[in-house]
């Protein structure tokens, strides 16, 4: 079903069970096929491909040559009906690729709200991206990667499959991340190493000075004190009783399967 207010260029091709919302625009030479839903006020520019079982929310902007919902690159994939789910107000720039999930995981790839995916960024199968993130030009999110809210993965960086990037973390350009990066941490290099907290990001997002000082203390316990990881965790448990912002660091320490960069 195509809403009567949608503007579809005559050179676009739409086939299958496609739902297009109010005030959506679809540019020339775009191909939309399969079980696709596009929410109200979304702009799909020219030469975009949207396929498979894909749901896109409202007020997104999708630039030329983006490919969304295509088959993933996992050799185990056998054509199962897996999905891509994209939220609202995202900017998906030129040649971004977002692949559908696999049945070996949650069978879906998820992009939240208010994210910027820059030119040629690659979002592999089963990736979960939160809200308000920045994924830089040519950045690669390997299969099953998780990126927390307000995190940044800068240009030409690669995140190894199954790694987690914590909320408000910042991965500098040209980095290779092979283990989890705790929330708030600034990391860079090949292999990526921690270089302090993402202080600029914390200040921009309204963290108060007492919170930032507590997070700096938590960082020092983990990375500068010479303590074992278990000893540092015990110190963070006490700190979290006063500062709730320390809790996400503890949660990732407990849930990490690949270990953290340290």
UniProtKB/Swiss-Prot annotation:
Pfam families: Acetyltransf_11 (PF13720), Hexapep (PF00132). InterPro entries: Acetyltransf_C, Acetyltransf_C_sf, Hexapep, Lipid_A_LpxA, Trimer_LpxA-like_sf. The keyword RNA-binding does not apply. Its EC number is 2.3.1.129. CDD domains: LbH_UDP-GlcNAc_AT. It is an enzyme of class 2 (transferase). Homotrimer. This is Acyl-[acyl-carrier-protein]--UDP-N-acetylglucosamine O-acyltransferase. It comes from Vibrio atlanticus (strain LGP32) (Vibrio splendidus (strain Mel32)). The gene is lpxA.
